[in-house]
């Protein structure tokens, strides 16, 4: 009676020990460093805080009053840089 291809494939794999197949393989990817995530979140929160403070108390804070419409650019730039950093997060 002819042997099936399935059985012959199992015989090839059975020659290696089962312990070799169970050992975990360490990946080379180390992930994102902690400082990167902290910086990313800090930039997003700082941008949000800048916009909220500008909206609530902007005219009462001297340097924010002098910046005028640039406050929106600063706040949104901080938010966008933080959001762009999320693309590098692993």
UniProtKB/Swiss-Prot annotation:
Domain of life of the organism encoding this protein: Bacteria
Localization terms from the record: Cell membrane
Keyword terms, alphabetized: Cell cycle, Cell division, Cell membrane, Membrane, Transmembrane, Transmembrane helix
Low complexity compositional bias, start-end: 7-18
Regions annotated as coiled coil: none
InterPro entries: CrgA
A biological process term (GO) from this entry: cell division
Location, primary (coarse class): membrane
Ranges for region Disordered: 1-27
Pfam family, one: CrgA
Function: Involved in cell division.
Family, as annotated: Belongs to the CrgA family.
Protein name: Cell division protein CrgA
Organism this protein belongs to: Corynebacterium jeikeium (strain K411)
Gene this chain is encoded by: crgA
